């Protein structure tokens, strides 16, 4: 009987210990989860063109050219599209717009609308691009086109923004920054035209959301 009681006591001690270790295990798990979140960021470089990239990465001229050309193709597919040149210029400034290829993501009915009014539709010039190492061996680079406005009245004035309107700071090539990996993910193709000022509104909303998120993060870290 004494032996049986001893076994029961050991079982109770084991159960008690397991229960009281659980918070520690949870804390360790949380640390690993936070470490995983930190690894979700990626360091990217911002360039205006392939020459800028090549100058900053000696021996990588071919990769820089490929990334630049891929960014141009991505810009054609995802950049905001306008039915008229005037709408595009009002947002991005004189000399910052070009006719977009008819196949660049637009639905046939929207192509017809744009062509009826101006013979084509319009998009901003690619002002630069983000470039970062691809995961999985680093065999190549991921890239994301960036746009910028020369119109002081636009929320995108003097800023690098992506096709979704997210702001990446001053339009100064040669910078390196850390961005979420989602920033380098392909954006959906633009299938409709944007009204005048519509892209600027998107930039303003994105900037407000970014500031709000940054403030929340700061408060959380500060307790």
Curated annotation (Swiss-Prot):
Belongs to the UPF0441 family. This is UPF0441 protein YgiB. Residues 178-223 are annotated as: Disordered. It holds the Pfam family DUF1190. It comes from the Bacteria. It comes from Salmonella heidelberg (strain SL476). InterPro entries: Biofilm_formation_YgiB. Residues 178-195 have a biased composition (Low complexity). Residues 204-223 have a biased composition (Polar residues).
